[in-house]
A protein has these predicted regions:
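Conserved beta-strand/loop scaffold segments within soluble protein domains that form the structured core
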Residues: 6-168
């Protein structure tokens, strides 16, 4: 359940019709703005799939900050599957920062399975800096990209696990 959204003159955040997630539209040539897309699960037994699509206009330069935290003190697993798709217009530039964390002293697992898919037009650039901080029992990360001429994707990924935690 979404608790709130804030659009600006250049960035429109729209809930998906008939589904879970958002469409984020960034107007062409938008500069020096940022978008925050947090997710938080505070109950055990929750399983959600969220689809967020970022439509970045030509020549736009923005920063997107996203992430999920699961606080699970119960005995049933909690799962967040965030599927983010980026549609980058010609000559656009995106810095995408994503952080995940799990906590809680229950026996239920904290599972986060992110997917990131990029379609970049000519000379578009996206830098993805993703971090899994701690406490996530299981994660399966999937990334894909379809790049136009001169387009660039840079992926920096840090995943911290301990004990019986797994990451793929």
């Amino acid at each position: 359940k979404s608790e709130g959204r804030h659009s600006t003159e250049n960035i429109d955040i729209v809930p998906k019709e008939g589904g879970s997630g958002l469409d984020i539209y960034v107007k062409p040539f938008t500069k020096n703005e940022n978008v925050h897309i947090p997710a938080l699960i505070t109950q055990d037994g929750v399983s959600e799939v969220v689809y967020n699509d970022f439509h970045i206009g030509e020549g736009a330069e923005i920063e997107i900050i996203a992430g999920c935290g699961i606080h699970n003190c119960g005995c049933d697993d909690s799962v967040h599957e965030g599927i983010h798709r980026f549609f980058l217009g010609k000559n656009s530039k995106v810095v995408y920062i994503e952080k995940h964390i799990g906590e809680g002293d229950g026996s239920g697992k904290r599972i986060i399975n992110p997917q990131t898919h990029v379609e970049a037009e000519e000379n578009a650039y996206i830098e993805m800096d993703t971090v899994q901080l701690k406490g996530v029992d299981s994660t399966k990360r999937v990334s894909s990209a379809k790049l136009g001429p001169g387009a660039t994707i840079v992926i920096k990924e840090k995943i911290m696990t301990h004990g019986h935690q797994t990451a793929e």
